[in-house]
């Protein structure tokens, strides 16, 4: 068992891509885990090796999470964990986890969550059932279900003109965001949806065509973003819900996805009732969000 170092990176990247093909091109976090630099102290990586051959890897990130652990200070997220098939059920994963947990406890971290920057927001029950069994054995508990959904765009009526006219009569305007409104969006997210505050730059990086906002009295009260075939995030100020704002923002975003040539929209970490009711979206993946308390809370 070894702490990940820069010399391990080439083999670690190949190992991760083989274990999780979708991570190709998105493995920058490995450099953080291996750097040993103070600014990356919150990125931890362990490898298991047989001689010079890498047979297991475990990476965690330590950060404050206002969604999963509001007001609890830094917690840990499991970014990636994998063991070579030939070395499974030989205690490799258990040893890696026990060493990582000891490190996190020594840092004063109270809990660990199964939320990855590169794989998924939870543990996919269909693809990673073995991982679920392992995590339960290690003391993790299920906290919530997370859904990915999809909707056929060629079967939807996406016109919002009547709904928008009704909102305008109520003093609410829905429009595509302008560059000059990026700071207002950032402030809105920081206040109303702090867990998405970092998305303000991301969702406008390719221009305002990806983002729609709802405004009342000169202030943003809702937003929706899309990227390629993915819809989201979306959010409406709690006091302004149940007025049809969310559905208008949703349909506008789906129109953008259809205009980019996609016949289906994908919705990650979806509010199942809202999307099923609004656009007859169907569930494509169910994940468990799991947590282990390790800090004696």
Put a short name on every predicted segment.
Residues 1-34, 41, 45-49, 146, ...:
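Short amphipathic alpha-helix that is part of the acyltransferase structural core
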Residues 17, 21-45, 50, 58-73, ...:
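A conserved beta-strand-loop-helix scaffold within acyl/acetyltransferase catalytic domains
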Residues 43, 108-109, 262:
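Short, high-confidence coil segments that cap the C-terminus of an alpha-helix
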Residues 56, 144-147, 222:
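A structural microfeature
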Residues 78-88, 118, 231-242, 271:
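A short, internal acetyl-CoA/4′-phosphopantetheine-binding micro-motif in the GNAT/acyltransferase core
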Residues 83, 89-106, 236, 242-255, ...:
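Conserved acetyl-CoA-binding loop-helix of GNAT-fold acetyltransferases
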Residues 97-168, 269, 276, 286-295:
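Acyl-donor-binding surface of acyltransferase catalytic domains
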Residues 242, 255-297:
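Short hairpin/turn module used for nucleic-acid contact or packing/dimerization
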